[in-house]
Amino acid sequence: MTVAESTCALVSTQPSIGKPTGGIATYSPAYTIVPTYECFNRCTYCNFRTDPGESSWMSLSAAEDIFKRLQNEQVCEILILSGEVHPNSPKRQVWFQRIYDLCKLALTLGFLPHTNAGPLSFAEMQELKSVNVSMGLMLEQLTPKLLETVHRHAPSKLPELRLQQLEWAGELQIPFTTGLLLGIGETNDDCWETLEAISKLHQRYHHIQEVILQPHSPGNQQTFNAPAFNPHQLPEVIAKARQILPSDITIQIPPNLVKDERWLLACVEAGARDLGGIGPKDEVNPDYPHLQAEELREILQPAGWDLMPRLPVYPQFDGWLSGELQASVRRWRELVIGNW
């Protein structure tokens, strides 16, 4: 029985929202930079990748133009989201250097970088720590059976490889975001086991900021022939995740993948108190435009929820950052708290 099937029996056809409890939901004012869409993985649900040579790489000059324009807008996070170059490829070092240079440029121009570029070597993670306030990598699902289906042609989706990234992030004291992709063939137990693995690592290193619960949402590029994960089933999954995960890990959902306002509120009520990075475009789900902050406030405020901006690093992790990064974070905290 899949998560979709087993959860369906637990969730009614209407969201269970009683008297609003109210509180704070957060989001990160963000802009996504894609160094390259090129990727050696071929996940069948992907709507992001291109084949090598099909698209140009982001140049530093093009990125600088974007960053300078963004200096006049309320954007604090630069998400460096990249397709993956094979670790043994002769282009790997050039690829990594481009990512590092983009992070450094963003930092120099006043932004807070967060990188998600697939599995990295320990040395690569260590180097990127100096120019990122946080980093991330989705676990998606740890069950090895997906290596026979949606991840059949995706070498970097080996469960042990991705878990190793979370462990290295803990050893390096890198504030980290991870998450699950729901509705790609996993069972209910698979889902809970992935959450339990995250919980176990966090209890050892105390480094996980957020866990994203992302419903599979079909797009125009994918070859995976399966329906969307029903967002009406998300509240129960969120509630279970809240039971499994330590209380200092924030649960995040992408609001553009939960179109029904009532169900979005139900997700927040169930324990998803962060709505992720909000920017002009969702690069991973390009067929699903982001809801902007004002639209989200119109949904949340009548139910008693205040939507507040946050930085891509949570305050309890500031001490893990270098002096330079701490100074940038301190400036942003004063700005966000004082004016936004």
Swiss-Prot record:
Pathway named in the protein's UniProt entry: Cofactor biosynthesis; coenzyme F0 biosynthesis
Enzyme class: lyase
Entry note: cofactor: Binds 1 [4Fe-4S] cluster. The cluster is coordinated with 3 cysteines and an exchangeable S-adenosyl-L-methionine.
Catalytic reaction(s) noted: 5-amino-5-(4-hydroxybenzyl)-6-(D-ribitylimino)-5,6-dihydrouracil + S-adenosyl-L-methionine = 7,8-didemethyl-8-hydroxy-5-deazariboflavin + 5'-deoxyadenosine + L-methionine + NH4(+) + H(+)
Record carries keyword NAD: no
Cofactors that this protein relies on: [4Fe-4S] cluster
CDD domains: Radical_SAM
Domain Radical SAM core: 25-256
Keywords recorded for this protein, A-Z: 4Fe-4S, Iron, Iron-sulfur, Lyase, Metal-binding, S-adenosyl-L-methionine
InterPro entries named among the record's database cross-references: Aldolase_TIM, CofG_family, Elp3/MiaA/NifB-like_rSAM, F420, rSAM
A Gene Ontology molecular function term of the record: iron ion binding
Binding site for [4Fe-4S] cluster: C39, C43, C46
Gene3D superfamilies, sorted: Aldolase class I (3.20.20.70)
Listed EC numbers: 4.3.1.32
Family note: Belongs to the radical SAM superfamily. CofG family.
Subunit structure: Consists of two subunits, CofG and CofH.
Function: Catalyzes the radical-mediated synthesis of 7,8-didemethyl-8-hydroxy-5-deazariboflavin from 5-amino-5-(4-hydroxybenzyl)-6-(D-ribitylimino)-5,6-dihydrouracil.
PANTHER family: 7,8-DIDEMETHYL-8-HYDROXY-5-DEAZARIBOFLAVIN SYNTHASE (PTHR43076:SF15), FO SYNTHASE (COFH) (PTHR43076)
Protein name: 7,8-didemethyl-8-hydroxy-5-deazariboflavin synthase
Source organism: Trichormus variabilis (strain ATCC 29413 / PCC 7937)
